Amino acid sequence: MSIAALVLVAAINNPAIDMDGYLRVAAEAAAYRQSHRLTEDEFLRMSHEPGTIVLDARSSEKFALLHVKGAVNLSFPDISIATLAELLPDKNARILIYCNNNFKNEETAFPGKAARASLNLSTYIALYSYGYHNVYELGPLLDAHATKLPLEGSLLLASDQQQSRSVREP
């Protein structure tokens, strides 16, 4: 690398952004994550256990449309020291996560993302970076219309209302 390039790199240094540190934590989290992926049945069982938090890091708009019943929403861009301390004060609490890429056949609420850009990956690494290591991830790709996981949201309400109208209409 030339002296000019080194000077340029030094000139744009930002101590609040640490790519090397991120990559180290991502590699550590990736190894840890392998033993923290759950089947649909495991996720369902664990979600009902006391002290377990189901976290949905999608946008509040997508969350309102459809989410796992009982989940709390913290949109990924809003994850910070302050928001985590408020929502998840116990870093040892069991946290279950899921994302768009866990559900198919409901693109409005769960639009698919590139596999390498899955929100589960970003969320897992972010939580791990903040010291939350008791995090479990829903593993499989599930049909949103056939999953065992209870879902709730405005899409279901609209669907129920539509079905009620069609049953009453001759």
Residue map of PLM features:
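Rhodanese-like catalytic fold shared by cysteine-dependent sulfurtransferases
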Residues: 1-37, 64-74, 79-170
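A short acidic-Thr-Gly-centered motif at the start of a beta-strand
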Residues: 41-50
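Short Gly/charged-rich anion-binding patches and loops
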Residues: 42, 58, 122
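Short, solvent-exposed loop/turn elements at domain surfaces
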Residues: 45, 62-65
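Short coil/turn segments at beta-strand junctions that form active-site/ligand-binding loops
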Residues: 50-55, 91-94
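Short hydrophobic beta-strand that contains or immediately precedes a catalytic carboxylate
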Residues: 53-58, 71-74
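Short glycine-rich, polar/acidic loop-and-turn segments at beta strand-coil junctions
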Residues: 58-59, 101
